[in-house]
């Protein structure tokens, strides 16, 4: 929260492939009362988008190098939105999930897989603005939903994306390989 306002957050590069403008267009169309959108990050489109989409309910944080501050921002946010058109597996998404944010991301790269099955809301990369225009009021009006999505996101990241879960998976893989007979040369 920012004061008495609920916080929606984008954290990442402000570049074409991140599709931040789709989020800003949807935000402008919906104007979610009682909420702020915080854009954390910098990039080639930062100045242009800030000039075009400047408003009292959009806060332009800029690049944040300090880890403790980034964590505090994530913990203050209720909803994390990642509207990317191109992505691998977003570290920012995993960090938001670990912080207990309700997460909304496109199906670009592995992000859709990470959120599938109830750990978040997955959007198509086609028509992101339209989808967000429908979804933002629901997230604004349903704090019980956002809390549950945040809980499930955190549970998912702790199950699958911690260092220990990756070590365990690697050990299982090695054990499976070692059980098989060596091939003759």
Identify the meaning behind each predicted range:
Residues 85:
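Aromatic "clamp/platform" in nucleotide-sugar-dependent glycosyltransferases that forms part
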Residues 94, 107-123:
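Short acidic/histidine- and often glycine-rich active-site loop of Leloir-type glycosyltransferases
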Residues 2-18, 24-28:
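Conserved donor-binding/catalytic core segment of Leloir-type glycosyltransferases
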Residues 117, 121-129, 138-143:
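Conserved acidic donor-binding segment of nucleotide-sugar-dependent glycosyltransferases
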Residues 145-160, 166-172:
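A short, well-ordered alpha-helix in the C-terminal region of glycosyltransferases
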């Amino acid at each position: 929260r920012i004061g008495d306002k609920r916080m929606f957050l984008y954290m990442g590069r402000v570049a074409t492939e991140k599709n931040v403008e789709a989020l800003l267009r949807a935000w402008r169309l919906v104007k979610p009362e009682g909420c702020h959108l915080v854009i954390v990050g910098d990039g080639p489109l930062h100045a242009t988008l800030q000039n075009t989409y400047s408003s009292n309910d959009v806060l332009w944080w800029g690049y944040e190098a300090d880890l403790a501050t980034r964590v505090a921002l994530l913990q203050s946010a209720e909803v994390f939105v990642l509207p990317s058109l191109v992505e691998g597996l977003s570290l920012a998404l995993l960090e938001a999930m670990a912080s207990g944010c309700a997460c909304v991301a496109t199906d670009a790269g592995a992000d859709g897989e990470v959120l599938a099955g109830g750990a978040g809301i997955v959007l198509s990369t086609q028509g992101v603005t339209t989808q967000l225009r429908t979804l933002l009021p629901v997230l604004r009006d349903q704090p019980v939903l956002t809390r549950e999505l945040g809980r499930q996101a955190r549970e998912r990241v702790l199950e699958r994306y911690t260092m220990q879960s990756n070590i365990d998976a690697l050990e299982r893989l090695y054990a499976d390989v070692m059980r098989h007979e060596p091939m003759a040369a």
